[in-house]
Amino acid sequence: PTLLYYFGFLTLAGRNEWGELKLTIPNQVIRKLYVERLREQALPHYEDQEQRQAIVERFYATGDLGPLCDLLEQTYFKVFDNRDLRWSNELVVKTAFLVTLFNDTFYLMDSEPALERRYADLLLRVRPDMRQDALLDHLLKFKTVSLKNIGLNSAELAATTREALRTLPIMVEKLQEAEQKLAAYRETLERAYGDTLRLQTHAVVCI
């Protein structure tokens, strides 16, 4: 972190409750460099990048989450072993989605936007000069569930379809929690932006 600070890739952001210095990404240009580097590491081949581009463009225009989730499962999350996955949380999932979806030409990307003292996870708001195109605004809320809580081992999980997983009680509960929060966030955003907003909301629960 010290070297990144001296090179200008991180900047001071005050202190935490313990008096320790906090560092943050200084601006959108540096944020884009981080995202592009992470994306190159996760998808090193040209064919992978082309596939990602096609999938995210489909998501931007339609809100189709299925192919995007498939891509993340087959690429980003494969780099984690079982020990890594034990410590994964909503931040890990959000980072994977942010890196995959990041496009500052089309969108104003906001991680954890403040919505009347509440925080959503990821907002993709179409840039004003791109509103004439077939782009939708997107708001995502992430939840995570452990294998222990759903009562499956890794082999059983791999053999279970996404549709079957959605019917498990803990998954139903988490999806409902996320959808309730998204409904409240939608009201706030629609009051702020009115008819210009074409908002799609997405509840994502990751095991």
Task: Give the residues covered by each predicted segment.
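Nucleic-acid nuclease catalytic cores
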Residues: P169-I207
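Extended alpha-helical interface modules used as scaffolds for assembling large macromolecular complexes
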Residues: P1-A178
